[in-house]
Structures are given as C-alpha cells and as structure tokens.
Amino acid sequence: MKFKLFILVFFLALNSSFSQVDESQTGAWYMYFFSHQFKDSQWGFQGDFQYRDWQGLGDMEQLLLRSGITFSPKDAGVKFTLGYGNVTTGQFGESDETSGESRIYQEALIPQKLGNRFYLTHRFRYEQRFVENQDFRTRYRYNLFLNVPLNSKELSPKAVYLALYNELFINGQMDIGDGREVQLFDRNRTYLGVGYVLNPKIRFQFGWMNQKTNAWGKGQLQFSMHHNI
C-alpha cells in the first residue's frame, strides 16, 4: 500500500511539472544510481544515469552518464571513487542545440550514524572538467546527506524514510577563456524528499530540490532509483 501511494504521488507531481512553461519554473530529474561491491574484495564500482528536463518530459536540460571504480580500505569507514562522467546539455525551448562536457572526478564517501536512526553521509568530490568552448576547469563539491527512517529504526525493507541533502559547489578557476569569468561560488542545491526501501537491493526516492547560483534559482522534482547490484 505504501509503495502504491509512492507511485501515485510520482504521477501527480509529474502531471504538475508538465504545466510549467518557463525555464525558471519547476523541472524534473529522473535518476538511476547503481553500486556493486565485488565479493571478498575492497574493490567495486558505482555510478548514475540522469535525464534532466526543463519542464517534465520532452525538453532535455541535461543527460548525465557517470561511473567509476571504488576502493574501500579495511576498517576505514570510507569509500574512494575514481570515475568519469559525460554530460550533454540542451537549450530551453525549441532549440536543438547542445553542448558537451567530459568530466574526471575523485570522490570520498563517509557514512555516519547518529543515534538510533539518523543516517548521515559526507561526500567530497573533486572534478576536472573539459567543457565545450571553455578552458579546462576544476570544481570542488561537498554534499551532506541525511536519511531518517520514519516507521522503523533501520533502513530495512518496507521502511519509509525522510531524505535531505545540501550540496555546495566551488569553482577552482575563475577564468574560463575568451575573457569570460565565473565566480568562486558555483551553486548550491537543497533537497527534501521521501524514500521507500523495496528490498535490501532497491529503494526509491521522490522529492524536490532547489538549485541556486548567483544569477538564477530553479526548482526540480527528483525521481530516483537506488540499486545495489
């Protein structure tokens, strides 16, 4: 019943996003996250596929494909990732024009549990960005995630949980070529959502994310599947 309610909310929110016609209005992100730890090994892999739309469906904002190799030192409580991402960005409206980006990244993921039911995760990420028609750039990111089970103390099957995160982006270079500059602060994302643990390998989340830069702000509906392969 809880899972059916989750699906109903998904489609009601999607219908609402279709009614938006302005690029500053709420868009939608559809995301699939995957991870795998090799048996009896400190090595694994993880990644994500994301389709981001300006309005709901039919007007691509971004297509992001990202994956990396992971290493988890014994008894260290941290997971390191070396990965690559490819990003295609579209223009709002009728234009079919796109721009591309290749991105190498290094990441440290540190989980932490506070009390009986507060699941924190710290993510530190450093990116080397090769953006079309721009000079080489780097960027620093820090994300603090918090998941709080509502109907149990653990993120176990059938658990409904509150999901929050805040992510800060800082540019490593101000000069991006041809006399163009960006500011030190790149953007900030704040998210509030609800999740459902279907089984030990799969969980779903639905929520709303507000993204702000120095120039603009935009809300996004986010629908995600998290899969331990």
Annotate each language-model stretch with its function.
Residues 1-22, 229:
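Bacterial Sec-dependent N-terminal signal peptides
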